[in-house]
Design a protein with these regions (language model features):
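Short, small-residue-biased leader/transition segments that mark boundaries at the very start
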Residues: 1-3
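An anion/phosphate-binding loop that grips the pyrophosphate of nucleotide cofactors and donors
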Residues: 6-8
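Rossmann-like NAD(P)(H) cofactor-binding subdomain of soluble oxidoreductases
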Residues: 12, 16-80
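Short, glycine/charged-enriched secondary-structure capping and boundary segments
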Residues: 24-28, 49-52, 86-90, 110-112, ...
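Short, well-ordered coil/turn elements that cap or connect secondary structure elements
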Residues: 30, 67, 90, 115-117
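Short, flexible, solvent-exposed loop/turn segments with mixed acidic/basic and small polar residues
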Residues: 42, 82-89
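Short beta-strand and adjoining strand-loop segment in the mid-core
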Residues: 48-56, 86-103
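Active-site-lining helix/loop region of Rossmann-like oxidoreductase modules
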Residues: 93-157
């Protein structure tokens, strides 16, 4: 592959404020690829996190507007970041994938299901990304106040 980005699925693991510039910089290389957004726009106030809503309603929708030739899917918002830094350790969580392209969502969920102890769920269109991005503030607040590393686990499914 002559392009610097050769993968069919690319995870953009940057902060919310870096996501737009990253998308603009790599837009041509990301054309036709599944792009995974895992950014949350949050602000910490003492022992609490609060969500910040971007103009498009979610970071994922903002990324899709910038990467209109790619298929943006949002996922991993509720998996504690420390879990990704210690991949050799037990990581148990449910991951909700939201995106407007059914095939892109399915592709990402298939990848997620290859990771032991992660379950993937179809969260519908990119409109639902705002729920995953903003719920991260609640989950982080719980983790800080209770001194835990909790993630999302859906029951009854």
């Amino acid at each position: 592959c002559a392009l610097p980005i050769c993968a069919e699925v690319v995870v953009v693991a940057v902060t919310a404020d870096a996501a737009p510039a990253t998308c603009r910089y790599f837009a041509d290389q990301l054309q036709g690829r599944v792009v995974v957004s895992m950014a949350n726009d949050l602000v910490r106030r003492g022992t609490e996190f609060n969500a910040v809503l971007p103009p498009h309603g979610s970071i994922a929708k903002e990324m899709q507007a910038l990467l209109w030739r790619s298929q943006v899917v949002t996922a991993f918002h509720l998996v504690p970041a420390a879990e990704f830094g210690a991949l050799d350790e037990h990581m148990e969580s449910d991951v909700v994938a939201c995106g407007d392209d059914d095939a892109a969502r399915t592709t990402l969920m298939e990848i997620i299901r290859t990771i032991p102890e992660l379950r993937a769920f179809d969260g519908g269109s990119l409109e639902n990304a705002v729920g995953m991005e903003t719920f991260a503030a609640v989950l982080l607040t719980i983790n800080i106040r209770h001194k835990v590393r909790a993630g999302l686990r859906l029951s009854g499914v």
